Design a protein with these regions (language model features):
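Helical "lid/coupling" subdomains associated with nucleotide-phosphate turnover
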Residues: 1-180
Length: 180
């Protein structure tokens, strides 16, 4: 099952940029370094520096205020995903759990927020079958790409094996036909 949901991490970045009146690249940086999807996971003394724009000085923002921007958008995203799963008749299938991939899955609190909405176990998908580049590739941002490469590789191997087998059986059939 695959589906397209029209909001994701970029929408969260846009929300942060608008709420903090900061450029999108800085909002993305703030999201990646300080983002939290569950306000209750933040500590009272945690702050985030927001660079000033147009010559204004930088200002400090509590990390819980940042989470207050992030949490509703991810809740909305997970609600949309849950509705899409139900609409396609797969709600009974998610009891085995959900695997998140991509950069969003790395944010603190995303897994726990998703578990509370989906009412099932959720984990971060991390590629693990590669030797030599583990420190780089064992990152959820590469999960989808690596999975597609692996699927393509298996598909090519399957097709090559089918061609080899077809060649053998074709030869056998020709021999049998020529003898009879």
């Amino acid at each position: 099952f695959t589906g397209v949901i029209p909001i994701a991490g970029d929408q969260v970045t846009s929300d942060i940029a608008q709420a903090l009146r900061t450029p999108t690249p800085q909002a993305e940086d703030i999201k990646q370094k300080h983002g939290c999807a569950v306000t209750e996971f933040t500590k009272d003394d945690e702050t985030v520096e927001v660079l000033g724009v147009g010559g204004r000085p930088p200002r400090e923002l509590s990390r819980s205020s940042l989470a207050d921007i992030i949490q509703p958008r991810y809740s909305e995203l997970f609600d949309l995903i849950k509705a899409e799963i139900s609409r396609n008749g797969f709600e009974d299938k998610i009891s085995a759990g959900i695997v998140f991939t991509g950069g969003t899955s790395k944010m603190e609190g995303v897994v726990e927020l998703a578990e509370s909405i989906f009412q099932t176990s959720v984990r971060m998908g991390i590629p693990s079958k590669f030797k030599g580049m583990e420190t780089i590739l064992q990152n959820p941002i590469y999960s989808t790409s690596i999975g597609l490469i692996e699927h393509g590789y298996k598909q090519i191997n399957h097709e090559m094996l089918a061609e080899q087998n077809q060649g053998f059986f074709s030869k056998l059939l020709r021999i049998v036909k020529s003898e009879y």
